[in-house]
Amino acid sequence: MSPTVFREGPFRFFFFSREEPRLHVHVTSPDGEAKFWLEPEVVLARQHGFGASELERLEHLVIDHEQEIRDAWQRHFGC
């Protein structure tokens, strides 16, 4: 199961139900995929296919939606 937290244009922000417990979010689009840690701070964990400007935009979107991502994580995992 991989619940979608939000969408922005071609980007889908989501997480996997059975993955590591450290708070993070995945992003996918037709052009690539990325994973961002949210703890201890928002930082790119890995990516494939995105250019520098897209990664910058994605990082800003994660920061802008950080509370929404945290709330979805807590609802889903019950922590």
Question: Where do the language-model regions lie?
Answer:
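Intrinsically disordered, low-complexity and often Lys/Arg-enriched segments
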Residues: M1-T4, G78-C79
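Charge-dense, helix-prone N-terminal extensions
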Residues: S2, P10-R12
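Intrinsically disordered, low-complexity segments enriched in polar/charged small residues
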Residues: R12, S29-D31, R70
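A short, structured beta-strand/loop element
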Residues: F16-A52
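C-terminal structural segments of small proteins and small subunits
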Residues: G49-C79
